[in-house]
């Protein structure tokens, strides 16, 4: 994306503040006009006092400097108050809109599909959010405080200077044009270099975040020195990329100072010649020297702003790229909130592909009656999770229909659909908040009594009450203050509070030891009662009592039936069951043999 396109996108993000933006634009125009009135009055006062009156377009009629001085005071006061008003409202606009865009960005990324979040580090998204909104704030502030005023000053000065003395005006703009061309060349040169600097910054951030996120691994494998050395290597690459940029911007400083000196001297030289020929006055020479100083200052502001924009461009580019990510699904204009559903789920010839080539599920059809338990079995990548994602409407199928209670779920609001579906994940997901706050995710208005009842039904009340703070106990980041079994039971309690008619269990006990699994299974039996339940399982012992088992392979259901029926068919499921139970029997035999061996040792 070009620098100009980044700039226009930044201004588009002003959104509802555009009206105030236009007000500030008018104020900046008045400010630019008033600022150039001061050099004009100064020059005319010099002419009046020297007696060398100009004969040009703005020749003073008064023979006394006092009226001109009074006008100067008036313009000066107007400039002061107008500058204060512009600065105040520009600050408020930039701060207010930064918060609005930050909130909008946060809402947007929460709506993006899980595939996006799986491929994007959460730390990067937070960095992009904070750095991007800060960059937007600085650009907006610079635009309304300096950049816009500088551009308007150029528009005011061009006709004004030509009107006063076109000869001096042509020299002034020729020299400033050279300055602008040289500066533009430097800016173009550094734009690509700055992108490399920001890329190195991202690598540095990712390297540090990666090490800090695995600090236990770093310490246990004695990798502190290695990680520090790795970070230092990336930091050295960053510094090497930064040095050429600094050199080019040092050249800009030299060009700016040289331009100021050369322009003032050139105007004085031409002014002396024109004065000797009677084509200009001393006051006009003074006036154009002031014009030159103001113009160079304004051009410096523009260059400084462009420099700032160029430095911020990679951050802004990242921010805009995330905003341009399209959510996989959205509410249709005529979507309805269905209220509480009964839980009749139908898949009718459903096909879906992530890449448009290889189908993740193909011609999937089945019906789950309210209260039934449907187990999904198959190898990793067989299509189980994709089928559940389609039910949850993380994606829409390319063909076929998913219905609940006879309604196409694409015609339901996302909020209305997902209120009817509860999920217990393989890894219990908890916020870094109190246990009560985590449980109320399922039901925000739940009373303390409801929390206790849900925790009791989920076999979680005992460990909660053993804590000194009870339901106010902090779960820690991602629930790390709790054991795996405790986290999972809280996840089940949360689902009980939500009380959905449809429940999804995604390998809910696969990472637990036998004792903890037994407790969690008791809780799962409680939460599954009376609900349409979908169980994704690799351990077949957990789905023995499922109403129906769907066996997936390459996106298709190749077998369907009860546990005993599928074993009797001697097909793919029977092979899986035989393999798993043989492994379990072998494990038991090994344990027994070890015990016998230990008992006969002298």
From Swiss-Prot:
CDD domains documented for this protein: ABC_6TM_NdvA_beta-glucan_exporter_like
Membrane-spanning parts: 22-42, 66-86, 146-166, 167-187, 254-274, 276-296
The protein, known as: Beta-(1-->2)glucan export ATP-binding/permease protein NdvA
GO molecular function: ABC-type beta-glucan transporter activity; ABC-type oligopeptide transporter activity; ATP binding; ATP hydrolysis activity
Free-text comment on this protein's domains from its UniProt entry: In NdvA the ATP-binding domain (NBD) and the transmembrane domain (TMD) are fused.
Key words of the record: ATP-binding, Cell inner membrane, Cell membrane, Membrane, Nucleotide-binding, Sugar transport, Translocase, Transmembrane, Transmembrane helix, Transport
Role summary: Involved in beta-(1-->2)glucan export. Transmembrane domains (TMD) form a pore in the inner membrane and the ATP-binding domain (NBD) is responsible for energy generation.
Membrane topology: Multi-pass membrane protein
Keyword Oxidoreductase: no
InterPro entries per the UniProt record, alphabetical: AAA+_ATPase, ABC1_TM_dom, ABC1_TM_sf, ABC_transporter-like_ATP-bd, ABC_transporter-like_CS, P-loop_NTPase, Type_1_exporter
Stated family: Belongs to the ABC transporter superfamily. Beta-(1-->2)glucan exporter (TC 3.A.1.108.1) family.
Subunit description: Homodimer.
Positions with a binding annotation for ATP: 378-385
Major subcellular location class: membrane
